[in-house]
Amino acid sequence: MPAYIHIEALSLDCDYSDYGANTHNFIDAWVAVDEQTIGCFELPSTFPVLKKGKHKVSIRPGIAVNGIGAARSYYPFCKPADYLNLELVEDSIITLNPVINYFPIGAGFNMAWKEDFESAIGLSPTFESDTSIMRVNDAQAWHSENSFYSGRIVLPPDSLDFTVATSEELTFHTELTGDGSAMLEMDYNTNDTMFVGLMYYKNYKTEKLPLVKVLPTDKEHGIPQKWKKIYINLGHIMKEENDASYFKVYFTSDLTTDYDVDAGYVYHPVNEQRYYYLDNLKVIYRPR
């Protein structure tokens, strides 16, 4: 007869000055007992463990890569929550409240770029953009103990599109050998559809590659009302284009593309201002 473990949710604990905000979207628990993986469990979950007595139980956070529910993975930038001598009792439920931490900086975690909009803005409009991005602290901005401002882009109904990109050139891609990985963490609140992608400079020209279509969050009277978080995989493109001079992350409302990013619908509000709020942006990587 098995023992049972119940996990309602995972929490993230991190130092704001080093890692930024502790927002997360951990939807799964990847569970190992005595270093052997027993499964990935969508939270909340109560699951059986065919062990009794004291055992090491490790919980790793799981995400939906690129916001795709079918693309589940554990998050490689976070340490597992370890219970070294957890007492497992047959036909009994033990409830765990795992607290997750990032790996130490320089030891499994590297911050290539971070933007929380609390000071100068590290995003710049491209030449084809019809507007820019501003830091605001209105009612829709992300507010917490350490956060008072968010980035906001507004397009009036008669405007065309915006594109903003990281002002900083990202050059860590040469370190991404083997199974090295890179990810963009992004909090957003929008009433419109937008693309997130990578632009890179190669062979004397700039290429743009959209990666993920981000759909609108909840809205009321045309104003976006709900913040969401997404994890966007950058590493595979950076490794494929390893001979590029540099990369930049970009955000755009221009949904015309030659790439089949998503077969789903494209939404634009009709006769409404289009709002795009961004916050807690992090480009993180771990080389191999």
Give, region by region, the residue ranges found by the protein language model.
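Extracellular carbohydrate recognition
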Residues: 256-282
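Extracellular carbohydrate-recognition regions
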Residues: 97-133, 276-282, 287-288
